[in-house]
UniProtKB/Swiss-Prot annotation:
It comes from the Bacteria. This is Carbamoyl phosphate synthase small chain. SUPFAM superfamilies: Carbamoyl phosphate synthetase, small subunit N-terminal domain, Class I glutamine amidotransferase-like. One of its GO terms (biological process) is 'de novo' UMP biosynthetic process. Residues 1-204 are annotated as: CPSase. HAMAP family: CPSase_S_chain (MF_01209). Keywords: Amino-acid biosynthesis, Arginine biosynthesis, ATP-binding, Glutamine amidotransferase, Ligase, Nucleotide-binding, Pyrimidine biosynthesis. It comes from Bartonella bacilliformis (strain ATCC 35685 / KC583 / Herrer 020/F12,63). Its EC number is 6.3.5.5. It catalyses: hydrogencarbonate + L-glutamine + 2 ATP + H2O = carbamoyl phosphate + L-glutamate + 2 ADP + phosphate + 2 H(+).
Length: 399
């Protein structure tokens, strides 16, 4: 394909300082902000209106460039409290971002503007393009392998960038969980943010949850802490023996990036053992996919994925609809679920699987993000469900 401008300003004649080069040869020009450099990644689009800082620091976006459909990004600035990456010094999350327009901040919590923050977090950004036209392209052709490049002088070797985009192998068969996981165990006690108080600390522990970190988000941990849990976050490569020695009352399988089939090589044998031990299990996103793989189901790469804070999901048990936050490019093939696994939730956009539970076992998972951050809180009840399974497990264990 030929070079494409997709500029949001049709009269602009400025020399482009950033490019997005797709593997199909499409070249999109715009203004560069944030980090300077070149990186290969998969381009997806996110339809959330708010929460750009939380989105960009979600480790599940590792290896991806996010095209924001909402036109103005940066309005509320950035701060040190809204980061979702558990280890922000390593800057796990999206490697690139695309905005129609970046705005000056106007918010009492802001301590940096978007450009400064992007530089610090090593995220390359392309601005001044028609992001909805790019979204239409992704919807038609699917998530695209690409290169995003930023040079303040506007010097680019387009042929070389096209070659890099075409040679990048993409997210299939890529285990990114091992790249973003914690390097050592962490004790977590921070609870959700409260107006005029900030984040509070949980000092009363009623039970112990071990959270396996495949790329976990902070707000997931906060909501479990709010239930009175002592939480130990462990690296993804922690052995079954080490986890069982911690005597958990429940085990959480976290969200994370990459191809679940690649992470499954070491994760699935562990999860199978936990299922056999009847320890309560709760999985979110990648954790959901890994639980499904552990019971013999299959996962597949999606055409464009689901990324946004406005995705309707039907609870097949209650017949209620939840508006959810989603971020995944792989999905569980519901036709591959064994008979002893019940499908509990489906997407109302495309009927893809969004939840399962193992019949006769205290184990369940969802594809979407009930913790939101950003997004609606319709699905917070799932943390209470996990809590109730743990309480029942403790009662049975003490008999």
């Amino acid at each position: 394909m030929t070079k494409t401008t997709l500029s949001s300003d049709p009269w602009s004649i400025k020399k482009p300082t950033a490019l997005l080069v797709l593997a199909d040869g499409t070249v999109i020009e715009g203004e560069g902000i944030g980090a300077i450099g070149i990186v290969e990644a998969e381009v997806c689009f996110n339809t959330a209106i708010t929460g750009y800082e939380e989105i960009l620091t979600d480790p599940s976006y590792t290896g991806q460039i996010i095209n924001f459909t909402f036109p103005h990004i940066g309005n509320v600035g950035t701060n040190s409290e809204d980061i979702e990456d558990l280890t922000p010094l390593h800057h796990y999350g999206a490697v690139g971002a695309i905005f129609k327009a970046h705005s000056s901040p106007s918010n009492y919590r802001a301590n940096e503007n978007l450009n400064q923050w992007l530089k610090k977090h090593q995220i390359i950004a392309l601005c001044g393009i028609d992001t909805r036209a790019l979204t239409a392209l992704i919807r038609e052709k699917g998530a695209q392998n690409a290169v995003i490049a930023h040079d303040p002088n506007g010097n680019f070797d387009i042929n070389a960038l096209k070659e890099r985009a075409q040679k990048w192998s993409g997210l299939l068969n890529l285990d990114l969980a091992k790249e973003v996981t914690s390097k050592q165990s962490i004790e977590w006690n921070e609870k959700p943010w409260i107006w005029n108080k900030g984040y509070t600390i949980n000092n009363e522990y009623n039970f112990h949850i071990v959270a396996i970190d495949y790329g976990i988000k902070r707000n997931i941990l906060r909501l479990m802490a709010a239930q009175g849990a002592r939480i130990t976050v462990v690296p993804a490569h922690t052995s079954v023996q080490e986890i069982l020695a911690m005597k958990p009352d429940g085990i959480f399988l976290s969200n994370g990036p990459g191809d679940p089939n690649a992470t499954a090589e070491y994760a699935v044998p562990m999860i199978k053992t936990f299922i056999e031990c009847n320890i309560p299990l709760f999985g979110i996103c990648l954790g959901h996919q890994l639980l499904a793989l552990a019971v013999g189901a299959k996962t597949i790469k999606m055409h464009q994925g689901h990324h946004g804070a406005n995705h309707p999901v039907k609870n097949l048990i209650t017949e209620k609809v939840e508006i959810t936050s989603m971020n995944h490019g792989f999905t569980v093939d519901s036709t591959s679920l064994p008979q002893y696994v019940e499908e509990t939730h489906i997407s109302l956009f495309d009927s893809t699987n969004c939840g399962i539970q193992i019949i006769g076992k205290p184990a369940f998972s969802v594809q979407y993000h009930p913790e939101a951050s950003p997004g609606p809180q319709d699905s917070h009840y799932l943390f209470q469900r996990f809590h109730d399974l743990i309480v029942n497990y403790r009662e049975q264990s003490n008999k």
